[in-house]
Swiss-Prot record:
Pathway: Amino-sugar metabolism; N-acetylneuraminate degradation; D-fructose 6-phosphate from N-acetylneuraminate: step 2/5. HAMAP family: ManNAc_kinase (MF_01234). The keyword Thylakoid does not apply. Its EC number is 2.7.1.60. It comes from Escherichia coli O6:H1 (strain CFT073 / ATCC 700928 / UPEC). This is N-acetylmannosamine kinase. GO terms for biological process: N-acetylneuraminate catabolic process. Belongs to the ROK (NagC/XylR) family. NanK subfamily. ATP binds at residues 5-12, 132-139. Catalyzes the phosphorylation of N-acetylmannosamine (ManNAc) to ManNAc-6-P. The lineage of its organism: Bacteria, Pseudomonadati, Pseudomonadota, Gammaproteobacteria, Enterobacterales. The keyword Nucleotide-binding applies. Keywords: ATP-binding, Carbohydrate metabolism, Kinase, Metal-binding, Nucleotide-binding, Transferase, Zinc. InterPro entries: ATPase_NBD (IPR043129), ManNAc_kinase_bac (IPR023945), ROK (IPR000600), ROK_cs (IPR049874). Zn(2+) binds at residues 156, 166, 168, 173.
Length: 291
């Protein structure tokens, strides 16, 4: 079976045709529309999959935001143009003429990453640090989605940094400190206006303000991991996302984790599937749903 997989993120939307053995037959990518207009998202999706839908037998979508019975709502209005009650599953059915499923992107990525962990692992957490911060949780070998799709939104757990305002309306969320958007937003003076990628490059060159921003991001993620370890007793944490997969970022997080009690130790890995975790996870989840 060939699946049309789509991953909707805060910055880009990816689509791929994925075969039964997990091979990518074709992959495309476009920028995520940020206008507060559902028609913009629908138009972008229609354009992206137009040349792929005829080859696929099902669709599988992973998207940032809350997915509740196929309906998408952005928890943080700064993401996806603040989409609310967007009937993503129905729209994909209309666009493609196919049946399929929709799941949160970090939940999907967690499921993909869990499948390649050693068989003895039954509890894990995936954290994506990208435009925003999200997560997916596997407990007793089962993915937690929650009664309303909210499970795993770890980016909106409070951090120890209280002077940052999050788009969700709270102050001090992990997302408001560690995400790519937060790093860019906090950049001042000579760093103002630079991309997160360039700020990381400046940090590697020893630029002090850049070092502070990237270290604060990593230390806040480490603090989050400790909290999740205490709550879930997870065996493994996998980190993904454009920031999470930046050169040296997981090592920074590991360094900050080392200051905590040994009881909070957890195995820490970068995402095996890199930026494709969401696409692969959505596909695997969809196939599990129909078997």
């Amino acid at each position: 079976m060939i699946t049309l997989a789509v991953d909707i993120g805060g910055t880009k939307i990816s689509a791929a045709l994925i075969s039964d053995d997990g091979s990518f037959l074709l992959k495309k990518q476009i920028s995520t529309p940020h206008e507060r207009c559902p028609d913009e998202m629908t138009g972008a999706l229609r354009l992206l999959v137009s040349e792929m839908k005829g080859t696929a037998e099902r669709f599988a979508v992973a998207s940032t935001g809350i997915i509740n019975n196929g309906v998408l709502t952005a928890l943080n209005p700064d993401n996806l143009g603040g989409l609310k009650e967007y009937p993503l599953k129905n729209i994909m059915e209309d666009i493609t003429g196919l049946n399929g499923s929709v799941i949160n992107d970090a939940q999907a990525a967690a499921w993909a990453e869990y499948t390649v962990l050693p068989k003895e692992i039954c509890d894990m957490v995936f954290i994506t640090v990208s435009t925003g911060v999200g997560g997916g949780i596997v407990v007793n070998r089962k993915l937690l989605t929650g009664v309303s799709g909210l499970a795993g939104h770890v980016g909106h757990i409070l951090s120890g940094v209280t002077d940052t305002e999050c788009g969700c309306g709270r102050r001090g969320c992990v997302e408001a400190v560690s995400s790519g958007r937060a790093i860019m937003g906090a950049a001042k003076n000579k760093l103002a206006g630079y991309s997160t990628k360039y700020i990381f490059e400046l940090a590697r060159q020893g630029y002090k303000e850049a070092e502070f921003l990237t270290e604060r991001s990593a230390s806040t993620i480490a603090e989050l991991i400790v909290s999740l370890k205490l709550l879930l007793d997870c065996q493994v944490v996998v980190v993904g996302g454009s920031v999470g997969l930046a050169d040296g970022y997981v090592q920074k997080v590991s360094k900050h984790l080392s200051i905590y009690s040994e009881i909070c130790n957890v195995m820490l890995f970068p995402a095996y599937f890199r930026s494709d975790s969401g696409l692969i996870g959505a596909t695997l989840w969809d196939r599990d749903c129909i078997t």
